């Protein structure tokens, strides 16, 4: 799929059909590999020149917003597809591939009545896209919250012994619990194990001799048990910390372990459900935003053509997709098809300043022109 298109508008002197034929002929002759399509814009409500000029101040900003939301949803789709391991699907608008929707654009009269003022159409587009963006933020935040909880659990299960969950490393038989005795779990730096074995019995009184047993070792630490009298447990923790050993809090509970397993399974299920629903929502919403964007491009082309070529509306709007190597050639063809007087006028410094911030790259050409990137 081509990812870069030009939307251009050429001034019509005789008839749009004759200009269209000349454009096709010139493209076929000098740049045959450049696809060219009519961009069918209906007769929109012009309003006053003042209203057009006021609208022009907002066109570029509104375009950036709508395009930005479109790209944001596309990036979210790509991330979700990558995480899910699903094959990327071609994005569509009402079942039509996005490039085909652009090149065969048809104005949606039911959604955007052509008799509505242009400002009202633009505000309507921006309002609809803003609602979708707000919905996206809420849905992504909900998904990321579940994902964050799972990541935190995974870090605890796969992190170092200083932070990870110990429940799956400690068996019931490793723990001695009675009225007077308690078993503590000490996290010992990997290269300090000899020091631990040499001193743990003397860190405080009433430590059971030879009670320390290694349960697990990772790249940084080793996990040891030690059994002692309950009444000296706090003193042992303090003495161990002073020696560089960490005594982890731990409570052996089969019920608690089962509860954690159930919570983890539910989080995994919730994440998969949210990911699937978010991906489907993104597919649908991308189509809605892309459709809104193309209608906005039609309004923008119409408004800028009136401001460039005057009233009544007399212009030919089309979509081209030249290869990079053919761009200069196609620009030259488009320029030759413009009226020479208009070419000089719209290339003047006065025009460049007046149209700056309005027509994107159009101030450098004697015709309306801006680029649409689909990737």
UniProtKB/Swiss-Prot annotation:
It is a peripheral membrane protein. GO terms for molecular function: proton-transporting ATPase activity, rotational mechanism. SUPFAM superfamilies: Vacuolar ATP synthase subunit C. One of its GO terms (cellular component) is vacuole. Keywords: Hydrogen ion transport, Ion transport, Membrane, Phosphoprotein, Transport, Vacuole. The keyword Nucleus does not apply. Phosphorylated on Ser/Thr residues by WNK8. GO terms for biological process: unidimensional cell growth. It is found in: Vacuole membrane. V-ATPase is a heteromultimeric enzyme composed of a peripheral catalytic V1 complex (components A to H) attached to an integral membrane V0 proton pore complex (components: a, c, c'', d and e). Subunit of the peripheral V1 complex of vacuolar ATPase. Subunit C is necessary for the assembly of the catalytic sector of the enzyme and is likely to have a specific function in its catalytic activity. V-ATPase is responsible for acidifying a variety of intracellular compartments in eukaryotic cells. Belongs to the V-ATPase C subunit family. This is V-type proton ATPase subunit C.
